[in-house]
């Protein structure tokens, strides 16, 4: 049995080294020693209003994974492994000048800027005004303070948004291709305010009656009365979606247009010397993972740390996102490292 285990370990290490060598990267051997933790506190327990704390039967401590020379930022993180039968935590020490903080989809909806949920039955973002307001509270109380704390040290703070590369947002925010002047920003802000506040935020009403078959009424019912239907007035999704007013945007922060694709984002990050990404934003189960700046893309090229309490999942049929966020961030931890806001700290000299 020991020979078998040793053989598997050697084979695994050889395969890892061979794979890394093929990519022309310097290799090292990671000693995967797992030490059982005794009575650890729940994970993600700093903001239980927004994220249900994570508790698992077994938790381990592993050796440091990322250990940069000249590191000035500590990012403790964890992942889950069914094979290890538990959660594995490890310290990381990274260089902030090689780090980008990215917020996925901070939509400025129902936040006072003008873009708002169409009535009586329109949807956008978390899909009801009440849910959007709750997400705004989370942004103000959790994400914005984190960005303010990290911005002075990290290389980049970035936001990803939907919509075309329009002339308003390209002059309102710094983008991958252009940094607007103060005059351009002022003019763009006025244009944004006008565009968002002159649109008629109406939607189709709920259907009051419709035909259903006698044979399959359930099928017909959901075909004609969907739980998430496009009822917004034409032109709604063509409006220039701003970064939410709940974020304190700085002139050096960079806007990502999803429509331009991941390759452009990747190249921009690499051109700026980025190796690490601290990822925040919405929604954990959708945009946070699967859009242009989501972790499914970024984790192919960078050391990605998902900030588990700086994201919210969509929460249909619930008054709180805490359980949905717990479930989706837990699932992500099978293949991603998860940290939390209180675990991201300056390295003590």
Question: Model features per residue range: what roles?
Answer:
Residues 3-12:
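Sec-dependent N-terminal signal peptides
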Residues 17-19:
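Boundary at the C-terminal end of the N-terminal hydrophobic targeting segment
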Residues 22-101, 106-125, 129, 140, ...:
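Active-site-adjacent betaalpha module
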Residues 133:
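Blade-loop segments of beta-propeller domains
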């Amino acid at each position: 049995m020991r020979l078998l285990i040793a053989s598997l370990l050697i084979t695994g290490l050889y395969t890892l080294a061979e794979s890394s060598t093929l990519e022309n990267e310097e290799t090292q051997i990671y000693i995967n020693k797992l030490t059982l933790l005794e009575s650890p506190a729940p994970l993600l327990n700093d903001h239980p209003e927004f994220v249900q704390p994570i508790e698992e039967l077994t938790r381990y401590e592993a050796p440091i994974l990322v250990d940069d020379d000249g590191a000035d930022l500590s990012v403790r993180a964890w992942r889950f492994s069914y094979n290890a039968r538990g959660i594995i935590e490890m310290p990381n020490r990274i260089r902030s000048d090689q780090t980008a903080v990215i917020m996925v989809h901070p939509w400025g909806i129902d936040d006072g800027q003008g873009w708002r949920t169409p009535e009586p039955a329109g949807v956008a973002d978390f899909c009801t005004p009440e849910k959007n307001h709750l997400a705004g509270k989370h942004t103000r109380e959790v994400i914005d303070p984190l960005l303010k704390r990290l911005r002075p040290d990290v290389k980049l703070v970035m936001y990803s948004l939907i919509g075309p590369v329009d002339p308003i947002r390209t002059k309102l925010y710094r983008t991958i291709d252009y940094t607007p002047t103060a005059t351009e920003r002022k003019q763009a802000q006025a244009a944004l305010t006008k565009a968002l506040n002159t649109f008629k935020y109406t939607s189709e009403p709920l259907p009051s009656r419709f035909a259903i078959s006698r044979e399959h009424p359930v099928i017909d019912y959901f075909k004609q009365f969907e739980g998430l239907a496009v009822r917004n007035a034409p032109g709604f999704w063509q409006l220039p979606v701003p970064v939410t007013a709940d974020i304190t945007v700085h002139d050096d922060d960079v806007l990502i247009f999803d429509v331009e694709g991941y390759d452009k984002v990747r190249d921009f990050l690499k051109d700026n010397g980025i190796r690490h990404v601290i990822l925040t934003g919405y929604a954990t189960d959708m945009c946070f993972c699967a859009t242009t700046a989501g972790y499914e893309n970024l984790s192919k090229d960078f050391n990605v740390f998902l900030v588990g309490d700086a994201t919210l999942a969509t929460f249909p049929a619930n008054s709180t996102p805490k359980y949905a966020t717990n479930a989706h961030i837990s699932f992500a931890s099978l293949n991603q490292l998860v940290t939390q806001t209180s675990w991201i700290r300056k390295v003590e000299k």
